[in-house]
Regions:
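Flexible "arm" and connector segments at domain edges
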Residues: 1-111
Length: 111
């Protein structure tokens, strides 16, 4: 389980990402836009998880362990980098949930 301090930092990162998204693009203009953006971020998150090929890398590391070979740091680095990309995409998903939760921007012509 991840430590509480780390959880707080992840939440802080999501809030910072939300703030950056609002500063750059404003609030969502409609539930349709909010849904589309959230869907895109979820798809990107899933792509990163699948692209990481974690199982293949873990299998290669396990093969090294079973045959008493030196651990290949490049494999560990690749797992780390892929996990980092996944974490970043997860933060973006969280941020879009927060952004949508803050409401939809009211248009001047709407009541």
């Amino acid at each position: 389980m991840i430590c509480e301090v780390c959880k707080e930092r992840i939440e802080h990162a999501a809030k910072n990402e939300r703030d950056a998204a609002i500063a750059q693009h404003g609030k969502f203009h409609s539930p349709h836009e909010a849904w589309a953006v959230l869907k895109e971020e979820v798809e990107e998150m899933c792509q990163e998880v699948n692209r990481g090929a974690f199982q293949g890398l873990l299998y290669m590391l396990w093969n090294d362990v079973k045959h008493d070979k030196k651990t290949d740091q490049a494999k560990l680095d690749e797992i780390y980098e892929n996990a980092f990309k996944c974490a970043c995409e997860c933060v973006q998903v969280m941020a879009m949930c927060l952004k949508w939760g803050e409401g939809i921007e009211k248009r001047p012509d709407s009541v």
